[in-house]
Amino acid sequence: MAQDARRLEPAAVQVRSLVRGFGDKTVLDRLDLDIPEGQFVALLGKSGSGKSTLLRALAGLDYDVEGRGGTLTVPEEVSVAFQDSRLLPWLKVLDNVTLGLGRTGTSRGAAALAEVGLAGREKAWPSELSGGEQQRVALARALVREPRLFLADEPFGALDALTRIKMHALLQELIRRHRPTVLLVTHDVDEAIALADRVLVLDRGQIVVDEIIDIPKPRALGDSKFHEFRTTLLGALGVEVAAQ
């Protein structure tokens, strides 16, 4: 029933028979995917499974890939955040957020920084910020453009555990306010279950697991249904979980 419901809803992302390869290696193998408007999808997979390749294809950043085929339909308004915040070190924080926004940029950028808890840091240099603060700036830069599709490639992977928890809460609040469609690439199964409406597992260029996470938020690790999803997803990743 969940699969049918996904097909009936308007799709923000539609992928058909997507192929991406490097040399003799096929990374994405005739992959199909629909993501409805406003859905938060987390993408799991082993290293080399094609997660970042798919995200880069959706972002239009893989124009130099030789082995390619299939079709992609995505909104024009797309923003991307990476594990590395990719702030320009020669620009102050506000200028990083507002780059390319035009005359209304200053007020919009200041509001976006306030939204991520960095009011008053507009004139700071990126080097003066902690890793968590830099990722907050990256989120502000992405969402100030009001994207219809937000792509995030392990944006919290380099942060400590406490900062990650805080960033999870911030991301959920920002998504609630701005309501983009989201694709989050992560290696963290618990992060995927805690945040997403739907979790995919990519293996050998194909989606092998597609789960709707129907647990009310906030989601607790100790919840029995959380454990069931965790066991299923870890199993798909080749990790055995001891019975409880």
Curated annotation (Swiss-Prot):
One of its GO terms (molecular function) is ATP binding. It is a peripheral membrane protein. The keyword Cell cycle does not apply. Its EC number is 7.6.2.14. It catalyses: ATP + H2O + aliphatic sulfonate-[sulfonate-binding protein]Side 1 = ADP + phosphate + aliphatic sulfonateSide 2 + [sulfonate-binding protein]Side 1. GO terms for cellular component: plasma membrane. The keyword Lyase does not apply. Residues 13-229 form the ABC transporter domain. The complex is composed of two ATP-binding proteins (SsuB), two transmembrane proteins (SsuC) and a solute-binding protein (SsuA). Part of the ABC transporter complex SsuABC involved in aliphatic sulfonates import. Responsible for energy coupling to the transport system. This is Aliphatic sulfonates import ATP-binding protein SsuB 2. It comes from Rhodococcus jostii (strain RHA1).
